[in-house]
Design a protein with these regions (language model features):
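Substrate-binding pocket helix/loop in short-chain dehydrogenase/reductase
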Residues: 97-98, 102-110, 196, 215
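Active-site helix of classical SDR
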Residues: 121, 157, 165
Length: 259
């Protein structure tokens, strides 16, 4: 407890899923948190549910729009006075064979997963440098490091995040540490996306059982990851325990990708 005292964190895509888990973990460790999300109502609801843990705020923001992100930074400075943690978590999932994936899906993935991260980094970089001893955490994916069929576009966006991550680790040093997290197969969000829901209906049983078998067959640690696993990694990277780590891309996937 208390590993993140005097941390003032902005978390994009913080209203649900991994972002919410990170917000909860940061609050539990003493940070103050501003949850930014495209769904402002859900962000406010999440903040209300987490306020028992500490000081938490909500703000509606479309990370693909510079004006929205600038307004977010202004609000963060208003409520915190400074920002020393930015977690670029907002993102979309999307899959499809390269010959079949729709143009609007391509545009959405590029805009949110890559352009949105770049805009947030651009706006918050001077704020973080001014805060000193600051941290930027960029959410990538193991698909940014390894190829999977149907994930060419998604993987391209996440590989782009890793390229930016390395460059900014040099550009923003020594005032800001810049690291990425590469999640593996997250149990809470993967069932429908990977077809396990529909497969379970055809074969009988349940999606969870299919996921467990998949983990045993494909993941060295033989288990799916959870949003809380990613949140714990974000706490580590945001804490003094990681003070000598920058430019890293932390795999949190049970050994599916090793580098």
């Amino acid at each position: 407890m208390g590993r993140l005292k005097k941390r003032f964190a902005v978390i994009t895509g913080g209203a649900s899923g991994i972002g919410r888990a990170i917000a909860e973990a940061y609050l539990s460790e003493g940070a103050e948190v501003l949850i930014a999300d495209l769904n402002g109502d859900l962000a406010s609801q999440t903040a209300a549910e987490l306020e028992k843990l500490g000081k938490v705020y909500a703000f509606a923001c479309d990370v693909t729009k510079f004006s929205d992100v600038k307004a977010l930074s202004d609000e963060a400075l208003r409520v915190f006075g400074k920002v020393n943690v930015l977690i670029n978590n907002a993102g979309l999932s999307g899959r499809g064979l390269i010959s079949e994936i729709a143009e609007d899906t391509i545009d959405a993935l590029l805009n949110v997963n890559l352009k949105g991260v770049i805009i947030c980094a651009k706006v918050f970089a001077p704020i973080l440098k001014n805060a000193n001893d600051a941290v930027m955490i960029n959410m990538s994916s193991q698909a940014g490091k390894r190829g999977w069929a149907e994930l060419s576009v998604y993987g391209a966006t996440k590989a782009g995040v890793l390229g930016m991550n390395r460059a900014l680790a040099v550009e923003l040093a020594p005032e800001v540490r810049v690291n990425a997290i590469c999640p593996g197969y997250i149990s809470e969000v993967g069932m429908a996306w990977r077809g396990w829901d529909s497969r379970s209906k055809k074969e009988g049983g349940d999606a969870g059982s299919i996921g467990t078998k998949f983990a045993i067959d494909n993941i060295p640690l033989e288990r799916l990851q959870t949003a809380d696993d990613i949140a714990r990694s974000a706490v580590f990277l945001g804490s003094a325990d990681a003070k000598e780590i920058t430019g890293a891309a932390l795999n949190v996937g049970g050994g599916v990708v090793m580098d």
